[in-house]
């Protein structure tokens, strides 16, 4: 498989983008989707004009998280005139704060959710095939102290009693994995589980606590860039259906009879339209959204907060290698840690919250996660200073009376609001990241039935974004990248970096001859950032830094980089000097409050390049002082 000329659009480069006369600079792959390429470079103003011209549509999806986006795509694939609105940025709520696992849910077997596990494993296997650029295998290790812990608790659950939280022994885990392997057999993509005895466990993992005598190894999967996958689903949906339209920073303000009033959160403009059906996909905010729609706040959601840490710990990274360690702490809470962007992703907590607004990983939660890791790796020193980044999100779980949060179902359901109003409202309750496609398909089928329309196209085997035409196997991948490097005059190293970020979608970009690297972040180039700004529906600096790039998550973000990115974004997004500085200030406040990234930390990460080589901050003054203090 080799790249061939296609239909790319380099208009985003403008007069300063360099560009290339080589047709290979705008290429697609043989074997890709039959859909036309996404509409590249559609500005927010143009999108709003298209929305104003609509008047009446078939379906309005409220909420731009992964489940709302999935429903939007499923409806677009059927040719439905569907609009999706998100009051913040796409993928900015719980969808941006998962454990980065694409998994069947081994723990859910304890709750008897066999159907959910079976569905999750099938969807995991499909994502490995349909989104191989972002979803990859994750060998997972379960450390075990003994053979029989948890046996009585499992028996109590089987007999209808309430189990006592606690550790699981080798026997229970072995039985669970046997069932897990059995359910994963359909469209199998990964190896079956294995067990290690005392000697092998201590030889292979000497950093484990001395009380750990056994280990189980099985395979699940992980996702590297969940936010990007969501954006690709939107682009694919809009390519499949010219009427489909998704807009961020546009929220539902109220429903007046059959007229939905939308508010642009950036300008305050009000836009109205009429929909035959509304899909409430606002996740943890479903009940609040229903209050806007009908004046009655429902009680469908009982969310729990999950917090995670990104740790800079070379010793822990060496101890676990490429495997995830999946373990129960003293309280019986399942915890995880695995390598991610060269660091350690660790989590998580499970705390009930009354409101999803403004959640963050508190100091007590960070301490809890660190202490849980020490239970398994007592010889590896960890402290607050090792935390590079922290994040939290609220799982939109169905309201339940469970005494233990882990017992609340992670399954999903579609529920029509009752009593019905002038416009029928379908609520998407629950759901986990892995099953977004199945949940979206279920929601779309429910809506199609209400509209009296049949499904015409399945997404089960439909490649996503940069997973289209993806080269199979390491040898084919190397050859593919070599061909791209030769045809575009780009170094193989640069091609490999772009491939890791975008998969085959990198061919929509491909750098021009004067693709200058960022002074403060040479892993990115100025043209690459311009392309992201032009094609990624970026409206704020936070959109760019937190959800179109991974530099905050990976510990690469510095104050210099924030200023350099803001300067690049100002012109295409139409920001004045004052607006640009306000964007910087808002981002710094958000990073400090929600992610534990203080301005002093960002200053300490600044480039060691001489000051004259760094871009001047907007508004003048010192790059190292603006926005701090």
Give the label of every model feature segment.
Residues 1-17, 22-59, 74-77, 615:
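Extreme N-terminal leader/targeting segments of oxidoreductases
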Residues 55-57, 268-277:
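Core beta-strand elements of the Rossmann-like FAD/NAD(P) dinucleotide-binding domain
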Residues 76-96:
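Glycine-rich FAD pyrophosphate-binding loop
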Residues 100-203, 335:
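Dinucleotide-binding Rossmann-like beta1-alpha1 core, especially the glycine-rich loop
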Residues 160-166, 183, 189-192, 202-241, ...:
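Helix-loop-beta segment of a Rossmann-like dinucleotide-binding subdomain
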Residues 212, 228-232, 296-345, 351-497, ...:
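C-terminal catalytic lobe of FAD-dependent flavoproteins
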Residues 248-260:
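A conserved short coil-to-beta-strand element within the FAD-binding core of flavoproteins
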Residues 280-295:
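Flavin (primarily FAD) binding-site architecture
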């Amino acid at each position: 498989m080799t790249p061939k000329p296609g239909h790319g659009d380099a208009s985003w480069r403008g007069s300063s983008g360099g560009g290339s006369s080589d047709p290979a600079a705008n290429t697609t792959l043989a074997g890709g989707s039959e859909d036309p390429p996404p509409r590249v470079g559609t500005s927010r103003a143009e999108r709003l004009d298209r929305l104003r011209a609509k008047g009446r549509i078939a379906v309005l999806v409220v909420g731009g998280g992964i489940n709302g986006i999935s429903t939007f795509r499923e409806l677009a694939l059927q040719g439905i005139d569907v609009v999706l609105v998100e009051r913040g940025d796409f993928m900015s709520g719980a969808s941006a704060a998962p454990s980065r696992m694409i998994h069947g849910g081994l723990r859910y077997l304890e709750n008897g959710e066999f159907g959910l596990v079976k569905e999750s494993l099938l969807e995991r296997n499909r994502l490995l095939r349909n989104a191989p650029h972002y979803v990859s295998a994750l060998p997972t290790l379960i450390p075990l102290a003994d053979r029989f812990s948890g046996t009585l608790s499992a028996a109590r659950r089987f007999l209808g009693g309430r189990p006592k939280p606690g550790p699981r022994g080798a026997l229970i885990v072995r039985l669970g994995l046997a069932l897990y392997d059995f359910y994963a057999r359909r469209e199998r993509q990964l190896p079956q589980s294995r067990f290690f005895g005392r000697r092998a466990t201590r030889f292979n993992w000497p950093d484990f606590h001395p009380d750990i005598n056994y280990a189980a190894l099985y395979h699940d999967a992980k996702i590297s860039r969940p936010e990007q996958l969501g954006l690709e689903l939107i682009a694919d949906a809009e390519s499949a259906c010219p009427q489909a339209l998704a807009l961020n920073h546009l929220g539902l303000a109220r429903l007046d009879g059959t007229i939905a009033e939308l508010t642009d959160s950036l300008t305050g403009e009000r836009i109205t339209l009429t929909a035959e059906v509304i899909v409430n996909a606002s996740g943890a905010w479903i009940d609040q959204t229903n209050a806007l729609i009908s004046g009655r706040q429902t009680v469908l959601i009982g969310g729990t907060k999950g917090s995670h840490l990104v740790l800079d710990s070379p010793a822990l990274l060496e101890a676990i290698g490429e495997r995830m360690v999946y373990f129960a702490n003293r309280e019986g809470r399942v915890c995880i840690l695995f390598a991610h962007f060269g660091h350690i992703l660790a989590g998580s907590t499970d705390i009930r919250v009354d409101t999803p607004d403004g959640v963050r990983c508190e100091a007590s939660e960070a301490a809890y996660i660190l202490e849980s890791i020490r239970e398994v790796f007592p010889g590896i020193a960890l402290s607050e200073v090792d935390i590079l980044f922290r994040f939290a999100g609220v799982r939109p779980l169905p309201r339940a009376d469970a005494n233990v949060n882990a017992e609340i179902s992670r399954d999903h359901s579609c529920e029509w609001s009752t009593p019905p109003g002038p416009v029928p409202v379908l609520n998407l309750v629950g759901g986990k990241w892995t099953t977004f496609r199945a949940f979206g398909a279920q929601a779309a089928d429910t809506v199609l039935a209400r509209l009296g329309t049949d499904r015409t196209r399945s997404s089960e085997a439909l490649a996503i974004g940069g997973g289209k035409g993806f080269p199979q196997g390491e040898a084919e991948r190397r050859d593919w990248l070599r061909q791209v490097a030769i045809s575009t005059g780009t170094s193989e190293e640069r091609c490999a970096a772009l491939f890791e970020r975008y998969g085959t979608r990198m061919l929509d970009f491909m750098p021009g001859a004067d693709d200058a690297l960022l002074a403060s972040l040479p892993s990115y180039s100025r043209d690459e950032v311009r392309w992201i700004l032009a094609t990624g529906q970026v409206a704020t600096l936070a959109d760019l830094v937190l959800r179109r790039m991974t530099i905050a998550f990976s510990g690469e973000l510095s104050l210099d980089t924030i200023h350099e990115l803001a300067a690049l974004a100002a012109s295409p997004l139409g920001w004045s000097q004052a607006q640009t500085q306000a964007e910087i200030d808002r981002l710094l406040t958000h990073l400090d409050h929600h992610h534990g990234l203080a301005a002093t930390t960002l200053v300490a990460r600044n480039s060691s390049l001489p000051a004259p080589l760094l871009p001047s901050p907007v508004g003048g003054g010192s790059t190292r002082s603006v926005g701090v203090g």
